[in-house]
Swiss-Prot record:
GO terms for molecular function: ATP binding; proton-transporting ATP synthase activity, rotational mechanism; proton-transporting ATPase activity, rotational mechanism. GO terms for cellular component: proton-transporting two-sector ATPase complex, catalytic domain. Keywords: Ion transport, Sodium, Sodium transport, Transport. Belongs to the V-ATPase E subunit family. It comes from Enterococcus hirae (strain ATCC 9790 / DSM 20160 / JCM 8729 / LMG 6399 / NBRC 3181 / NCIMB 6459 / NCDO 1258 / NCTC 12367 / WDCM 00089 / R). Coiled coil: none annotated. This is V-type sodium ATPase subunit E.
Amino acid sequence: MPIDKIITQINETAQLERASFEEMKRKEIDQKFEVKKWQIEADFQKEKASKLEEIERSYRQLRNKQKMQVKQEILNAKQEVLQRLFTEATLQLENEPKEEQLALMKQMIQTLPINGTARLIPGEKSADILTPAVIAEWNEELPFELIREDFTEKAQAGLIIDDAGIQYNFLFSHLIKEIQETMSAEIAKELFD
């Protein structure tokens, strides 16, 4: 029976080797599974962090864009208020009593460095008050002579003095615009701070 014993021993050895091989393969599979699982988890965490960063970046961009829009809207509203203020100032100047308008115009032209004669171009809205009598009265007091033109500056109040091509613009809208250009920032600071 030694053959039976050898066969049994071979079977037992084969069974042990198979069990050992199966155990080794199972551990190898488990190890590969764990490595793959860890890799998938790491990739997932990396992807999650990347997506989260992308969402945060998009949120920051959107928030900054909204802040800029709000600032722009506030700036536009302030500019609109300032523009309305200067438009109202022009209208108020145009609606001053006739005597005050004439006094203002006379005061402005008295400072001009003109010799000889100059042309007076009235604004359409002031043409009725810049009568020949008013101009004659001014000519008596001025060191130069004004000659009134027949045409007017359309839809304007005030006047322009033309001294041989050099024009002195005293239209009320122009005067207010000069104030707007030089004092806009200062007025805005007073109004909005």
